[in-house]
A protein has these predicted regions:
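Carbohydrate-interacting regions of secretory-pathway proteins
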Residues: 327-375
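A compositional/structural signature for long, glycine/proline-rich flexible linkers
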Residues: 1-330
Length: 375
């Protein structure tokens, strides 16, 4: 009996760690939803960073140059219309953190803005013409887009969004509700997932809110094995809570190790030559390579980053985005956030050339650097 109990304790611990690593993206979306809805209800509340992003906004991987705008979309039993502005990079991800649609420069509207129709799970009604149609498997969605400054001015992008962006049920197209645009620059808020035991609480929130058909049955089975099951309360007893607390601690240090010290060549742009790593090992926004999920790549991405779209992995010059990251310097020493780091001296090292608007990586001596080629 004692041996069997130890075996089951170990089994529950293993499943807790794997549930953490395989579901961190779900918790991330739960954190995003909570942080955004603190400012107002879904569908009518739009967060605008009119004065750009700052340290009071706890987000994953934002920059302080783009003009971020975001809202939480909650579907019901009918399609929802989203009227989008031009000249933005916009994405819609579902509650499981799966890609639904692009809009703007990388979308079907080709940067001109347009009307998108988001079809909820199980909808059997007619779908009218005149919309960019996207089918989804969840009710909750994260909608985010970013505009660009014009000669250092954020107003053109902000004002265009306020004038054009609308969200409403299809049945209300003749009388759409008013949108509430909130400037959240300088306002403290947190959209980041938990890293401790409470990450399981966040995962449970999404499992309870969404149809099971939208998620992988294998993953749902893993979550059910630790007590997270749709239609049932997540109430682990003292023994199980202790095990899951330890599992979360191990999961947290594991994803940090995956991010800071990737051990597979596929994580690096130039294995053995450079520390610059790709956010999408395997080259897929779905984290799939040769038919198999890149499990470590998915976990490490969703630990530190946010936003899923094929535009981040496709080489869409002038439209999409390409990213590189590094946790160490060229000598493999960890970057220390408590220290002041010197900017890359491109004049001395000759690593920056001005050409055609692409962000690429350059190999060479002295250390590998980032080369910006742009007008």
């Amino acid at each position: 009996e004692e041996t069997a109990q130890k075996v089951y304790d170990n089994l529950d611990f293993q499943r807790g760690v794997q549930a953490y690593l395989s579901s961190i993206q779900i918790a991330s979306m739960a954190g995003m939803r909570k942080g955004m809805l603190n400012f107002g209800p879904a569908n009518t509340t739009v967060l605008l960073f009119e004065n750009l992003m700052d340290s009071k906004a706890l987000w994953l991987t934002p920059n302080t140059v783009s003009i971020y705008m975001a809202m939480w979309l909650e579907l019901g039993d009918e399609p929802m219309v989203i009227e989008t502005p031009p000249n933005v990079l916009g994405i819609i991800d579902d509650h499981w953190f799966n890609y639904v649609a692009d809009f703007g420069n990388a979308g079907p509207d080709k940067g001109k803005g347009g009307k998108f129709l988001i079809i909820p799970p199980g909808y059997k009604g007619d779908i009218p013409k005149g919309y960019h149609v996207a089918h989804t498997k969840t009710y909750g969605h994260w909608v985010i887009w970013r505009g660009s400054q014009v000669n250092g001015d954020t107003a053109p992008a902000v004002n265009t969004t306020k004038k054009i962006f609308r969200v409403y049920p299809l049945s209300q197209k003749g009388n759409p509700p008013e949108m509430n645009f909130i400037n959240v620059s300088g306002k403290f808020h947190n959209t980041i997932h938990r890293m401790d035991y409470e990450i399981f609480e966040e995962i449970n929130e999404v499992v309870q809110a969404e149809p099971a058909e939208g998620q992988n049955p294998e993953l749902l089975g893993l979550l059910a094995s630790i007590g997270i099951k749709k239609g049932q309360p997540f109430e682990p007893d003292a023994r199980m809570k202790k095990i899951l607390t330890e599992a979360a601690d191990v999961g947290a240090v594991t994803v940090r190790a995956l991010a800071a010290r990737p051990r597979e060549d596929k994580f690096y742009y130039y294995p053995g030559e450079s520390v610059w790593a790709t956010p999408f090992p395997g080259g897929s926004h779905e984290f799939i390579e040769d038919g198999a999920v890149v499990i470590d790549g998915r976990a490490y991405f969703h630990f530190y980053a946010t936003g899923i779209t094929p535009a981040m992995t496709s080489k869409m010059v002038g439209k999409g985005s390409q990213y590189a990251m590094a946790y160490t310097d060229a000598d493999g020493k960890s970057l220390d956030g408590w220290k002041v780091l010197e900017k890359y001296d491109y004049e001395r090292h000759g690593k920056v050339r001005v050409e055609d608007g692409r962000l690429v990586l350059e190999k060479g001596e002295p250390a590998t650097g980032v080369r910006y080629e742009g007008k």
